[in-house]
Amino acid sequence: MAGGAAEAAAAVVEVGSSGQFEELLRLRAKSLLVVHFWAPWAPQCAQMNDVMAELAKEHQQVSFVKLEAEAVPEVSEKYEISSVPTFLFFKNSQKIDRLDGAHAPELTKKVQRHASSGSFSPSGSEHPKEDLSLRLKKLTHAAPCMLFMKGTPQEPRCGFSKQMVEILNKHNIQFSSFDIFSDEEVRQGLKTYSSWPTYPQLYVSGELIGGLDIIKELEASKELDTICPKAPKLEERLKVLTNKASVMLFMKGNKQEAKCGFSRQILEILNSTGIEYETFDILEDEEVRQGLKAYSNWPTYPQLYVKGELVGGLDIVKELKENGELLPILKGEN
């Protein structure tokens, strides 16, 4: 065990100076270089160091680096590191991607993607640019109203993004968002794609409306409400969600990963019936989580619906199964 731990630790290089970092960029130019900007006082950084050590075992062709953000401020400032943990990805000494926050599955995905994507050349063929342009077009059209921002609507990571979210919410505007910190290629590419150098950026039907100043002007002139689509009232939204599939389960987590014991048990029961069903993760939408309690007058989760009607929670589903009534109800026969 001790030997394995030492081997894993050795696979992650610790950098203590700007000079050492620049030298490492030069020496490891041919491979993917993943740099973890961390701090010893942040427990989530320790967890991500463990994740990185495991990834280093799996991807021996990738170079993994730990850099204490506050100990090497010149590097942190150069790459706009404002919080820890933050991960930067380099190829050919060029930064190609970024991940802010302790997101182990996302880190694993990015390492796998970039490690398998072959050599990256900033001055390469035109095809990657065409691919990026197509990707940006899809992203800007991903929803009728798309906000490209720093962070998420729940956790904006700059004052301008926070103000933008507040304005959109105040006007009950329905929008989806993209965290530009999660994808460096999109962050840089969108500036050129739309000839707009700053964030946040708001798009309607794929067309750039503008940044915060423009949105404030549109709000002042009363035009904002006519340009952006309105969010449906919560009750309408809950009605649509509960009818999204014939059998709908509102739970903590999803089919692949239940995040509480009650949700896990109800998944096992539903899976044993062979009936198709869909799930909604209430942990990802606080409005739905709270609203559904009042909508159905049922204070706890999970909640099971058939054709938009509440069947009940885990205890009721267990009773129905024991009585042999569950399958007919799920099939809509009762």
Swiss-Prot record:
PROSITE patterns xrefs: GLUTAREDOXIN_2 (PS51354), THIOREDOXIN_2 (PS51352)
GO annotations of cellular component type: cell cortex; cytosol; nucleus; Z disc
Residues modified to Phosphoserine: S116, S119
Domain Thioredoxin: 2-116
Gene3D superfamilies recorded: Glutaredoxin (3.40.30.10)
Residues forming coiled coils: none
GO terms classed as biological process: intracellular iron ion homeostasis; negative regulation of cardiac muscle hypertrophy; regulation of the force of heart contraction
Pfam (any one): Glutaredoxin
CDD domains on file: GRX_PICOT_like, TRX_PICOT
Molecular function via GO: iron-sulfur cluster binding; metal ion binding
Main location as per UniProt: cytoplasm
Composition bias type Low complexity, residue spans: 116-125
This protein's UniProt keywords: Acetylation, Cytoplasm, Iron, Iron-sulfur, Metal-binding, Phosphoprotein, Repeat
Domain notes: The thioredoxin domain lacks the two redox-active cysteines. This strongly suggests that it lacks thioredoxin activity.
Assembly and oligomerization: Homodimer; the homodimer is independent of 2Fe-2S clusters. Heterotrimer; forms a heterotrimeric complex composed by two BOLA2 molecules and one GLRX3 molecule; linked by [2Fe-2S] clusters. Interacts (via N-terminus) with PRKCQ/PKC-theta. Interacts (via C-terminus) with CSRP3. Interacts with CSRP2.
Name of the featured protein: Glutaredoxin-3
Gene (name only): GLRX3
